């Protein structure tokens, strides 16, 4: 059994489990998000301010799902900060956002924009969005923000295993804001954003985690090069991907 695999192999194992073994992607996502949420809940109580930073892919979808699970556990100070082109959101991400918005306790999602491109930049550390508050400066039920608000706990769900090129543009600014506000505790979902999940290299900028909750198998990017310095404590959580899927992935992409 391969206990450490590359991010590329992990992604291939996910696809094999979904496409060949017919395991629903949302089932895997629900399990992964629940494991990450349970880890956070074991460390911090329902009164904790938690900011979940999400990209538009399935790592971001994990983050949104995690937020909804925490709401269901009685956490009421959960905020979502989104980054990326809405047109590039995955089907799973959109499903998780609809599920989030269906919860009466949800807070208004915040959409990060670079300060240079925002026509009316705000001051750093805007006030937290209140549950069910009306959006005041964006269509689609979102609040546009050029800065991230301070928080007690930061959840990094931006890139996960999918990053293999330098971080640029609004994503670089987003990660820089995450680095700026990081204070008490940061949990990375699967892989700290900015770390190449295969090589462990920093792709221009990366977010320092205190704990990385990674799914199925540990990733080579967490133990190679600069990966260990950014991953913090590495916790591997089983999410129901069969060994057959990992074996197929390693055959397809030998490291």
List where the protein language model places each region:
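Generic serine detector
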Residues: 10, 25, 33, 42, ...
């Amino acid at each position: 059994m391969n206990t450490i695999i590359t991010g590329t192999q992990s992604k291939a194992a996910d696809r094999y489990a979904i496409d060949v073994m017919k395991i629903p992607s949302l089932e895997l996502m629900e399990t992964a998000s629940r494991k990450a949420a349970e880890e956070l809940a074991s460390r911090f109580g329902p009164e904790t301010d938690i900011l979940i930073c999400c990209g538009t892919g399935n790592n971001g979808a994990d983050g949104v799902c995690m937020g909804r699970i925490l709401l269901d556990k009685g956490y009421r100070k959960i905020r979502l900060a989104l980054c990326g082109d809405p047109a590039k959101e995955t089907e799973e991400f959109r499903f998780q956002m609809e599920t989030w918005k269906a919860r009466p306790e949800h807070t208004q999602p915040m959409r990060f924009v670079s300060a240079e491109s925002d026509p009316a930049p705000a001051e750093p550390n805007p006030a937290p969005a209140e549950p069910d508050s009306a959006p005041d400066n964006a269509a689609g039920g979102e609040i546009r923000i050029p800065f991230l608000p301070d928080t007690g706990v930061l959840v990094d769900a931006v890139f996960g295993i999918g990053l293999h090129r330098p971080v640029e543009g609004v994503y670089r600014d987003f990660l820089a804001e995450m680095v700026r506000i990081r204070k008490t505790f940061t949990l990375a979902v699967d892989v700290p954003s900015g770390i190449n999940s295969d090589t462990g290299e920093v792709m221009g900028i990366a977010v320092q985690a205190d704990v990385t909750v990674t799914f199925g198998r540990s990733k080579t990017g967490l133990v190679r090069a600069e990966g260990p310095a950014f991953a913090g404590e590495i916790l591997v959580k089983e999410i129901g991907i069969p060994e057959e899927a990992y074996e197929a992935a390693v055959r397809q992409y030998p490291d």
